[in-house]
Amino acid sequence: MFLPAGSQDEIGQTVDNRSKAYEIFRQVMILRNYKQISTPVVEFADTFTNEYAGMNLQNMLKWFNREGEIEVLRPDWTTAIARALVKQHPSELKWSYQGSVFRRDKDGIESRQAGIEIVHTPVFLGEGESLLTAVQYLKELNIADYLIELGHTGIFDELTAPLQLSDQELDQLREAMHDKRRDVVFTIVNGKASKEQADEITAMVDAFGSFDVIEEYEVKWKDNPRLLEIIKHLKKLATLLTERGVKDVSVDLGRVKNLPYYCGTMFRGYLKETGATCFSGGRYDKLYEQFDESISAVGLAFDVDVLADHLHIEESYERICIIAEEASHAYAEELRHTFTNAIVDIQYTDKDKEKFDRVFKVIKENDEYKVVEQ
Amino acid sequence: MKPTIALTKGRVEKQFLKFFASLSYDVEPLINKGRKLRVETDDFLFVFAKGVDVTTYVEHGIADLGIVGEDILAEFQPDVYNLFPLPFGECRMALAKEKGKEWPEGKRRIASKYTNITKEYFKQKGESVEIFKLEGSVELAPILGLADGIVDIVETGTTLKENGLVVTDEFMHFSARCIANRSSLKIKRNELAKVIEAFQRGLTVK
């Protein structure tokens, strides 16, 4: 029997690591006062493809139901949770979730995520809490070598506002910025504005780095109140992270949103050893506009598969084998519970004894069971 | 760890080495590499691969930078930073048919290595066509009757001419480009900055 491309069976360490990553996540969430939420794995496609969510139907696993409507396997948590949260009382502010998403545009059809959504919360508090939750979770996973990058959708919006680009031109420019394709960025802007404006926007392609970039643009944008407000906001978040011991914080001022619902700060975490993205997220108040709600909303999702791959779990349990037989199985089971904090297995033969640190055998003497260490 | 650069084998490789040498990098080990597909220099690790494989290595972070034709990027749309054009490997995408033959009145049959580009080209024109995917020598398809025309890259036009084909439309202009892995550009910024700046200086000089 074969599996479809992108699907796979997993055994042993991979599954152990993932379970561990989920366990630690749940523990961190409890201690940081998050409430768990889960949404169904099957949803209507429109939840994710409407103009507010803006996801691409082509990348979803989908089918027609009996009424002819398109249903999909959940491709994204944030959108599904927004749908669910509008029915919740606004006093609940912090939500956490864990489970799979299914998309065809990623390696493997199924990927596992764990994440948070914070609603009805002041901007800096919500964003700071999101980032510091990420910092604590990575610390609990013993992951220290990572980079957190901040961006902001408002920079692109502010710089392109005077250009009066059509929606199509705006999409082309956003795509060129996303790919850091400087020649195309320059060409699009130069056709609509002065060379100075084209140079200014093209420079955004290279505007990534640490506090030196923040300070450079604090000076450059000193006469633009909106951009100055954004760069100061990013600086405050970056400072919060460095004060909490994050060694590598950077900004990418040329980063653009890849989904229409992002509207403000964007976050991304990279594992420096492999370059893999271990979390991403940001502000998405706009997502709630589809429900006629004006809500402050921010969150991020961890890629649990990436984190699990990176985990090195030291197994510290002693491994014990009890050799018994059908008649002595109950006695052996009783004996098992006397070994606390050890991995104990009951077997009927000693052929696997090399796999254990200690081996005991249940024997019968004078109609009584006793145990002998081998 | 030295940055890894994936380089497209063949014509792009030769043109790149000339360009790289003009930037005062030592290209001797790269020229005299024999059949080796992995060569370490003082500053970089180079890997040599087919164009589409260069994009795969860069997308998955095996290579930090890649040198590849823009036709490959347009066709396969890899998830990489597509930084800037390089001053070589210039060509254009063209629609061609047999000289002296008219297009059929019905649905046109088009052969190409670049099926995604072809599909998008005719979509923009609002025309439905049958597309045949070929891996090479696309010029044969109209001659042998598989297709009414072809979509392919053209440098000088000599191959088309020698096979009795004429260009009826040119719609994309390409060159070689420098691409980067999305994480590497951020994480290895300092290591990559020097060579990226050198490439850009080379463009200015041109």
PLM regions: where:
Chain A
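Positively charged, Gly/Ser-enriched RNA/tRNA-binding surfaces
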Residues: 20-28, 44, 78-89, 95-143, ...
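A structural signal for short, well-ordered beta-strand segments and their strand-loop junctions
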Residues: 36-39, 95-97, 147-151, 250-252
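Short, basic, helix/turn surface patches
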Residues: 62-73, 175-176, 279-282, 367-374
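Cap/lid and interdomain-hinge subdomains that line or gate substrate/regulatory clefts
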Residues: 122, 126, 149-150, 156-159, ...
